[in-house]
Amino acid sequence: MKIILATSNKHKVLELKEILKDFEIYAFDEVLMPFEIEENGKTFKENALIKARAVFNALDEKQKKDFIALSDDSGICVDVLEGNPGIYSARFSGKGDDKSNRDKLVNEMIKKGFKQSKAHYVAAIAMVGLMGEFSTHGTMHGKVIDTEKGENGFGYDSLFIPKGFDKTLAQLSVDEKNNISHRFKALELAKIILKILNKG
């Protein structure tokens, strides 16, 4: 069984390939011509399913027999911002680049008079194939701070300190991050489903 990842985000592709290294993984653009997918769901799970369905439906009939489309939708929910940016994490600033999104998050927090806040990351994984549709979910709790620290990671990693740590995700090694991340937790559950489907 082959897995096609319903994302063109290079950072996400690397992270997903690392965590799912027991499977034969292909990035979206290795199999299909890239196309835009409108993420108009109201939850992480809905958006993950929208992306996985779109990619699976774009495969030809032979490919559909060989592939499962796997998608991740994830984001950060900040308590003092009433759970925002949430499902809009990737496009929070309106510009779609990580630095602008981080800057907006810090500015919004400071506007409310806070230098840090409790926050949590959420990841929803969706899998779509001829056998049906499946989804899993993972969370990681911690706090966001107003100063970027660390060089690793992407997204909001340089602002987020996981619970039980004194470093941001961007200061942790790839292995340290992958062992605690929301995406890792959701993918560990997804692996169980994928192994069952592979036997079937």
Swiss-Prot record:
The active site is at D73 (proton acceptor). Mg(2+) binds at E38, D73. Its EC number is 3.6.1.66. Its cofactor is Mg(2+). The keyword ATP-binding does not apply. Keywords: Hydrolase, Magnesium, Metal-binding, Nucleotide metabolism, Nucleotide-binding. It comes from the Bacteria. GO terms for cellular component: cytosol. It catalyses: XTP + H2O = XMP + diphosphate + H(+); dITP + H2O = dIMP + diphosphate + H(+); ITP + H2O = IMP + diphosphate + H(+). Binds 1 Mg(2+) ion per subunit. It is an enzyme of class 3 (hydrolase). Substrate binds at T7, S8, N9, K10, H11, K12, S74, F154, G155, Y156, D157, K177, H182, R183. InterPro entries: dITP/XTP_pyrophosphatase (IPR020922), ITPase-like_fam (IPR029001), RdgB/HAM1 (IPR002637). One of its GO terms (molecular function) is ITP diphosphatase activity. Pyrophosphatase that catalyzes the hydrolysis of nucleoside triphosphates to their monophosphate derivatives, with a high preference for the non-canonical purine nucleotides XTP (xanthosine triphosphate), dITP (deoxyinosine triphosphate) and ITP. Seems to function as a house-cleaning enzyme that removes non-canonical purine nucleotides from the nucleotide pool, thus preventing their incorporation into DNA/RNA and avoiding chromosomal lesions. Homodimer. NCBIfam families: RdgB/HAM1 family non-canonical purine NTP pyrophosphatase. HAMAP family: Non_canon_purine_NTPase. Belongs to the HAM1 NTPase family. This is dITP/XTP pyrophosphatase. It comes from Campylobacter jejuni (strain RM1221). The lineage of its organism: Bacteria, Pseudomonadati, Campylobacterota, Epsilonproteobacteria, Campylobacterales.
